[in-house]
From Swiss-Prot:
Annotated effect of mutating S157A: Does not inhibit interaction with ECT2. Strongly reduces phosphorylation, inhibits interaction with ECT2 and cleavage furrow formation. Strongly reduces phosphorylation by PLK1, inhibits interaction with ECT2 and cleavage furrow formation
Modification Phosphothreonine, positions: T161, T249, T260, T342, T567, T580, T588, T601, T606
UniProt entry keywords in alphabetical sequence: Acetylation, Cell cycle, Cell division, Cell membrane, Coiled coil, Congenital dyserythropoietic anemia, Cytoplasm, Cytoplasmic vesicle, Cytoskeleton, Developmental protein, Differentiation, Disease variant, GTPase activation, Hereditary hemolytic anemia, Ion transport, Isopeptide bond, Lipid-binding, Membrane, Metal-binding, Microtubule, Nucleus, Phosphoprotein, Spermatogenesis, Transport, Ubl conjugation, Zinc, Zinc-finger
Protein name: Rac GTPase-activating protein 1
Cellular component GO terms, alphabetical: acrosomal vesicle; centralspindlin complex; cleavage furrow; cytoplasmic side of plasma membrane; cytosol; extracellular exosome; Flemming body; microtubule
Protein's organism: Homo sapiens
Length: 632
């Protein structure tokens, strides 16, 4: 019984303590909360008063600005009037000075010393007096013409419409249309003559031809001194507009468009009517698009235009690329998932730090640069040889590696800056693309005199690369093969090898000595040339990926699945050279083993990119690899 009473008392004491704890401090806290609300109310009231005061000040400033604009207009008109008055006054002053000079000469030449004027002097003075009004009128007439030209060409003039021009044969000048005036009505494109005769001289052509020409009319007027007839000769010629190089290349046409093919005269490929991405996507990792309604305006990556509020847009779940529904087929491929973080120092990490864990393992900056270069750079002379602006390259690199969204490379005017960005990224990696460990293997494979053994050794070295390096190298080689096949760039395999040799091959150690650097500089281009000589089918296999865990309703596939440029056939099989007993006597002992290794790496049972799926998917069938349902 005592134990029960003791337990009940303990429970009662605990309840009392808890009630005291709960009752303590509540009033103080509520009072403090009320005081805080009162402080915020007062601040809100003060802010409201200040807002009203600033609105009044803004209205006063707008009124003052309007008044000052009116005053400025009147001041400009007054300045024009004063300029004309000054010109007339200067002309009158010059005339009076000439008359005074004539009178001075007349008086100084008089040697008689007589105070009275002779008859000749009186007649001369009378002539000057009579000729003054006529000369003044003539001078005013000439000056009025000069004033008209001056008012039209004056930079300080307020009225600059120039919409009405009076045709005057006395105005002789050669005038070329400015860029601003080309966009106005056609009636203003004729300056030195009526528009009627000029229109007859123009040949009837397409709208494109008319839009690329301007009319320049030259009129020469000859006025004889003896009062003979006045002769006028007019010539009319068409001059093409000056265009920037970016407008020639920035048409945003894909690589496999018909118009681009006709101009480049490349090897034949599959023709399609739909617009595709700059490279094929057969077997590539495709975008996993989801539709959303735009709340905050965003920019479409393929076309660069803004997607306005309330419009429907598509966004990839992996790489966060945003596009219009009609631009989905032009999004860059392959789809590279966006990284959560970047290395501490921009651009100075390992290549694996810039790629995701899904295949193909290619840095996003490489994919976007290559796609933009192939869209509008394959007609640019000296691609990758001409350097871009260092400041632009640095800013783009910051945006790619620091900002979560993808910067719009289509808004970069200089395509060489994008090329420099790609080279700068690959050059500033802590380890080159071909790695320090395999540097010597690649150089030794490139220097093998026998072509079959050299290619087999190159296959072996590529197969030993880390997956990120191998995938990036394959993507880059496919791109450089396209650049080499374009005749407009004037960058063949040898030139590209000289440019990319130090960038992707580099050296076997981080800080080589000068002697090693000189030796490697001669060997690096050979490695790139040998890599570019490998067939396109070999590099394309690394771009193929099994589409796992992707909703088929979201898959958007390009119809141009097999439209990449064809690489010329080489003289060696992918599985190594065909040998005979006599031929094997001339080979090195390692050639057969290298060929056997290449043969084993190219079998169809080899897993691609370390796929996590348990069942192998047949990627060797013909046609498209994935279904292409339309997005609803």
């Amino acid at each position: 019984m005592d134990t029960m009473m003791l337990n009940v008392r303990n429970l009662f004491e605990q309840l009392v303590r808890r009630v005291e704890i709960l009752s303590e401090g509540n009033e103080v806290q509520f009072i403090q909360l009320a005081k805080d609300f009162e402080d915020f109310r007062k601040k809100w009231q003060r802010t409201d008063h200040e807002l009203g005061k600033y609105k009044d000040l803004l209205m006063k400033a707008e009124t003052e600005r309007s008044a000052l604009d009116v005053k400025l207009k009147h001041a400009r008109n007054q300045v024009d009037v004063e300029i004309k008055r000054r010109q007339r006054a200067e002309a009158d002053c010059e005339k009076l000075e000439r008359q005074i000079q004539l009178i001075r000469e007349m008086l100084m030449c008089d040697t008689s010393g007589s105070i009275q004027l002779s008859e000749e002097q009186k007649s001369a003075l009378a002539f000057l007096n009579r000729g003054q009004p006529s000369s003044s009128n003539a001078g005013n007439k000439r000056l009025s013409t000069i004033d008209e030209s001056g008012s039209i060409l004056s930079d300080i003039s307020f009225d600059k419409t120039d919409e009405s021009l009076d045709w005057d044969s006395s105005l002789v000048k050669t005038f070329k249309l400015k860029k601003r005036e080309k966009r106005r009505s056609t009636s203003r494109q004729f300056v030195d003559g009526p528009p009627g005769p000029v229109k007859k001289t123009r040949s009837i052509g397409s709208a494109v031809d008319q839009g690329n020409e301007s009319i320049v009319a030259k009129t020469t007027v000859t006025v004889p001194n003896d009062g003979g007839p006045i002769e006028a000769v007019s010539t009319i010629e068409t001059v093409p507009y000056w265009t920037r190089s970016r407008r020639k290349t920035g048409t945003l046409q894909p690589w496999n468009s018909d118009s681009t093919l006709n101009s480049r005269q490349l090897e034949p490929r599959t023709e399609t009517d739909s617009v595709g991405t700059p490279q094929s996507n057969g077997g590539m990792r495709l975008h996993d698009f989801v539709s959303k309604t735009v709340i905050k305006p965003e920019s479409c990556v393929p076309c660069g235009k803004r997607i306005k509020f309330g419009k429907l847009s598509l966004k990839c779940r992996d790489c966060r690329v945003v596009s219009h529904p009609e631009c989905r087929d032009r999004c860059p491929l392959p789809c590279i998932p966006t990284l959560i973080g970047t290395p501490v120092k921009i651009g100075e990490g390992m290549l694996a730090d810039f790629v995701s864990q899904t295949s193909p393992m290619i840095p996003s900056i490489v994919v976007h640069c290559v796609n933009e270069i192939e869209q509008r750079g394959l007609t640019e002379t000296g691609l990758y040889r001409i350097s871009g602006c260092d400041r632009t390259v640095k800013e783009l690199k910051e945006k790619f590696l620091r900002v979560k969204t993808v910067p719009l490379l289509s808004k970069v005017d200089d395509i060489h800056a994008i090329c420099s960005l790609l080279k700068d990224f690959l050059r500033n990696l802590k380890e080159p693309l071909l790695t320090f460990r395999l540097n010597r293997a690649f150089m030794e494979a490139a220097e093998i005199t026998d072509e079959d053994n050299s290619i087999a050794a190159m296959y072996q070295a590529v197969g030993e690369l880390p997956q990120a390096n191998r995938d990036t190298l394959a993507f880059l080689m496919i791109h450089l093969q396209r650049v080499a096949q374009s005749p407009h760039t004037k960058m063949d395999v040898a030139n590209l090898a000289k440019v990319f040799g130090p960038t992707i091959v580099a050296h076997a150690v981080p800080n080589p000595d000068p002697v090693t650097m000189l030796q490697d500089i001669k060997r690096q281009p050979k490695v790139v040339e040998r890599l570019l000589s490998l067939p396109l089918e070999y590099w394309s296999q690394f771009m193929m990926v099994e589409q796992e865990n992707i909703d088929p309703l979201h898959v958007i596939e390009n119809s141009n699945a097999f439209s990449t440029p064809q690489t010329p056939d080489i003289k060696v099989s992918l599985l190594g050279p065909v040998t005979t007993p006599e031929h094997q006597l001339l080979k090195t002992p390692s050639s057969s083993s290298l060929s056997q290794r290449v043969r084993s790496t190219l079998t169809k049972n080899t897993p691609r990119f370390g796929s996590k799926s348990k069942s192998a998917t047949n990627l060797g069938r013909q046609g498209n690899f994935f279904a292409s349902p339309m997005l609803k």
